[in-house]
């Protein structure tokens, strides 16, 4: 396929001089709307919408209140309760902003309201206390992804206040369990399809833009493909016994040996049309740097595992050349004075598109040997999904909006997401999805999603509201005060045979 090659833009050379710190530049969002958006963002962050805490409905109500106050009728606001993990009752929110004269199929906006657990003892500050400090907003969900929830909501509310009327319905879907089971997205793409059916979807889960630590723009990646999420449980068994009489074999030691094998193992490197186009762009950006040389070597020979390993050693490129698996949790033993009878490790894999999870299971089992049991998580069996096809209108809208806010050096390119999102469930059901949120950070120091002291630059949040306004105007046409922005058309390199 050549779906990505026609939209690839020339990157700014990596040898360019360091630019102004983007965190210090003024936002394009008016002060009154900054205050409104900040207050909603603060309230959202301070709701601990972690699984089993029952707080997702509070986030749904907060967002729904904004739409309702802007004029969306109650009949177009749907609270959808469901069970995610066993015993974990959560909720999704579906809101339809109707066009008075729809001429095209609806556009779907995706996000999720749940967040990953955060321990107060691990963080410098309370993760569920909204904090603004040194040009950043801190708190769990500031970058994954209550920022996107609030930005898309407030962009729509602001447009409604300005009298904008779209020429297609815009549907907002915010799930309640993206970080665990993805049950909400499964239901929304199937059972609730009458409420969510759309021509295409735009996912606000994850920012497309980033800068390096010298403040040079690294570009804006439109994710059109995702790796498949799959968790496996590795278990060892042993007769056990009294701890005063150690055996030569031990369930914990055996499991540790297996995990060391996983740590050192590298799956076969792979490329597809999206990742190849991405790395061609990165090679141009890197020039003749060591990383640029390794990328060109791997593009010339996709089986060059040494070059792929060197690429993956760069923190910006981890997970982009192959399937990756990593141990994430451990449990074992039953008493401090007894030899362990079993030990279990949770190993999470992000599988390259097109590779079946069953094939990865076979490969892992062969790696660790017959004495370690390898089984997939029965609560979630990953399903590989196809890449979304190129949509020039989406690319043009993203390019115009991101370059209006961050300058022409923020080039747009295709990419594959190493993470998993609700978009995969819609892709599997025939609705193409594009991950395009306009927020940004300094890479890698701001890449703290799921980690400690999660944060987002203040300007990145405010400008994201403006970004989504421009996206809605570009892709939903309509009536009302028009944007003064002239569209920026991407330049395309020659088509390859």
PLM features per residue range, with description:
Residues 73-75, 103-106, 167-170, 196-199, ...:
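Loop/turn elements at helix/coil->beta-strand transitions in domains of secreted/extracellular proteins
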Residues 33-41, 55-59, 63, 148, ...:
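Stable alpha-helical elements in mature extracytoplasmic
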Residues 20-140, 159-168, 347:
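Acidic/His- and Gly-rich active-site-bordering loop/insert found
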Residues 136-137, 143-221:
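Acidic/histidine-rich catalytic neighborhood of metal-dependent amide-processing enzymes
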Residues 4-15:
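Bacterial N-terminal signal peptides
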Residues 50-52, 83-86, 100-102, 113-117, ...:
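Solvent-exposed loop/turn segments at secondary-structure junctions
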Residues 19-21, 207-218, 222-469, 473-497:
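Metal-dependent amide/peptide-bond hydrolase catalytic core
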Residues 133-144, 412-413, 453:
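Short pre-catalytic strand/loop immediately N-terminal to key active-site residues, enriched for Gly-Thr
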